[in-house]
């Protein structure tokens, strides 16, 4: 990757994923100001990174401490929180490194800068793959909960969930190494784009199936006698599905501009309009970090148990039932 592309900026970016050819003359643009690289202060990245780290650490602590949250879905949420922490940590460290280099307080060799640049990019890519895989795992967990409710506890045990999480992170680590090895190849970008759209399509299919089933179930309940009510377990399952749907929607909203950026790099690297769009890369990076900040808020908003555990941890209460 071209470290000069990254470290000449005052805010972090993925070099290979953000670099684009020199912009055309102003006469060929829709507006020279619109095509200029967006400047975002390093403090913004650091603030988002710190807030995200604190929030996601709180999520993991809450699940670990509260025995009532020791279920496959919450362990998958912990893994998703770890992925959010990784992208925040990567961007924060890269921001600090860029600030140090720009201040001339340390003299670093180009080879070291290149190496660190690849590591930061690899961390973000690992976080992306881990987020996608964990969201897919949660979607499958909710699918099994709804369609195989009576067999759920034998199909999806805590041990199986933890094993799956371990496999996910091992695969993500391998992907991270491959990203570094093939950092100069555009196939890395193609693989990321393909994985993103394939996973989104698969998860979308699962959720459409789940909500069509829920709609059919509600229609059947409506024709039953007054005694026929929705079982609490069924209501809980659908609530969990809604929560994960919200998470998926936020994920797509925050990451889609970044992936459009990648698509434009591949398909129209010299088009003036594409160049104008890719010039706003730092904005898309801020959106990615915002996703890491928003996710824990969704957990807290949708789960009373998790929200109460947050309060107990923040208040320093030690009367938690460890289950």
UniProtKB/Swiss-Prot annotation:
TM segment ranges: 38-63, 76-100, 119-140, 161-181, 187-210, 246-268, 278-301
Residue ranges annotated as Extracellular topological domain: 1-37, 101-118, 182-186, 269-277
Cytoplasmic topological domain residue ranges: 64-75, 141-160, 211-245, 302-323
Topology class, membrane: Multi-pass membrane protein
UniProt note on tissues of expression: Brain.
Biological processes annotated in GO: adenylate cyclase-activating G protein-coupled receptor signaling pathway; circadian regulation of gene expression; homoiothermy; locomotor rhythm; regulation of blood pressure; regulation of feeding behavior; regulation of heart rate; sodium ion homeostasis
PANTHER family according to UniProt: G-PROTEIN COUPLED RECEPTOR (PTHR22750)
Function: Receptor for MSH (alpha, beta and gamma) and ACTH. This receptor is mediated by G proteins which activate adenylate cyclase. Required for expression of anticipatory patterns of activity and wakefulness during periods of limited nutrient availability and for the normal regulation of circadian clock activity in the brain.
Name the record gives this protein: Melanocortin receptor 3
Organism: Mus musculus
Gene: Mc3r
């Amino acid at each position: 990757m071209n470290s000069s592309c990254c470290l000449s900026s005052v805010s972090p970016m993925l070099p290979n994923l953000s670099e684009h050819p020199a912009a055309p003359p102003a006469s060929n643009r829709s507006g020279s100001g619109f095509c200029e690289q967006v400047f975002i202060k390093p403090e913004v990245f650091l603030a988002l990174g710190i807030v995200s780290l604190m929030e996601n650490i709180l999520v993991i602590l809450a699940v670990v401490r509260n025995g009532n949250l020791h279920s496959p879905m919450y362990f998958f949420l912990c893994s998703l929180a770890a992925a959010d922490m990784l992208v925040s940590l990567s961007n924060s460290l890269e921001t600090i490194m860029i600030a140090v280099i720009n201040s001339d307080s340390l003299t670093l060799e180009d080879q070291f800068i290149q190496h660190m640049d690849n590591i930061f990019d690899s961390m973000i890519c690992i976080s992306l793959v881990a987020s996608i895989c964990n969201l897919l795992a949660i979607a499958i967990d909710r699918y099994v909960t709804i369609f195989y409710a009576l067999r759920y506890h034998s199909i999806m045990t805590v041990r199986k969930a933890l094993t799956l999480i371990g496999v996910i992170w091992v695969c993500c680590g391998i992907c991270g190494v491959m990203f570094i090895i093939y950092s100069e190849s555009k196939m890395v970008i193609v693989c990321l784009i393909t994985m993103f759209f394939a996973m989104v399509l698969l998860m979308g299919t699962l959720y459409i199936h789940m909500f069509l089933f829920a709609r059919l179930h509600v229609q059947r309940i409506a024709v039953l006698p007054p005694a026929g009510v929705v079982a609490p377990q069924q209501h809980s399952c659908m609530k969990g599905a809604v929560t994960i749907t919200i998470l998926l929607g936020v994920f797509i909203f925050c990451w889609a501009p970044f992936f459009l950026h990648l698509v434009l790099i591949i398909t129209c690297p010299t088009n003036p309009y594409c160049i104008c769009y890719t010039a706003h890369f730092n904005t898309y990076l801020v959106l990615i970090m915002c996703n890491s900040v928003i996710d824990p808020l969704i957990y807290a908003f949708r789960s009373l148990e998790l929200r109460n555990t947050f309060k107990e941890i923040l208040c320093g209460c030690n009367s938690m039932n460890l289950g």
